[in-house]
Amino acid sequence: YFTTEPRDNLKEYFNLGMNFTNTIAINGGSENARSYFSYGNTTANGVMKNNTFSRHNLMFKQNFILFNKYLKLDFSANYINQKMENVPMSGEARNPLYSLYKVGRDVDMRYFKANYKRVAQTVDDITLGSVQYKRLLGQDIQNWPWAGENYNNPYWLAEKTYSSRSINRLILNGTANVKIIEGLNFQVRYSRDQTFDKNIDQRYATIRFKTKES
């Protein structure tokens, strides 16, 4: 995997990021009632492998003017579904840039892209922090010949770590306005904002982290 021709490992690691956005809206009504509906979605593929983003947004609005304008009703609902997968990490251990900057330009990273993992032998141990675990004979471990804290194969990080965050959000608003006499109104408002947030973080134990100091 050593080469006499200098390689641009950063350029070869990253992909072309792409982002797509689509929207559609419909509205209509009369003097006393109007309706509005819209849908929008965004999908994106990041510059790093397996990094994706998607977002869906539904919006509905309705208003009424009743009883010769003595009662006005307004209602809106907004639903948002959003999912992010494998957002690039900062720091050192799980940040592929850390290793890409450290590896020499005489290393052909295409080899480690095609061979980012290997099967553990009897001599292979895994260490997480200051704790050493039993040997993982026959299990996948990262193929990376250089030892060092936080120093990991960037292609192993892309293929063998997974994180996601899913967000479902519902926003409701309602207003009722009653005209009592000219210049005097009574108004009631309702609002609700509810969010469900789910996070997943998975990683293989052979990722090298900095040993904790006592």
Give the location of each predicted region.
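Generic secondary-structure boundary/loop-capping signal
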Residues: 10-11, 45, 94-97, 181
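Outer-membrane beta-barrel transmembrane strands
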Residues: 15-31, 39-40, 154-201
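Periplasmic N-terminal accessory/gating domains of Gram-negative outer-membrane beta-barrel systems
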Residues: 7-17
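Surface-exposed loop/interface segments of Gram-negative outer-membrane beta-barrel transport/assembly proteins
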Residues: 1-4, 47-48, 61-169, 187-214
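Predominantly transmembrane beta-strands of Gram-negative outer membrane beta-barrel pores used
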Residues: 13-14, 21-43, 47, 57-65, ...
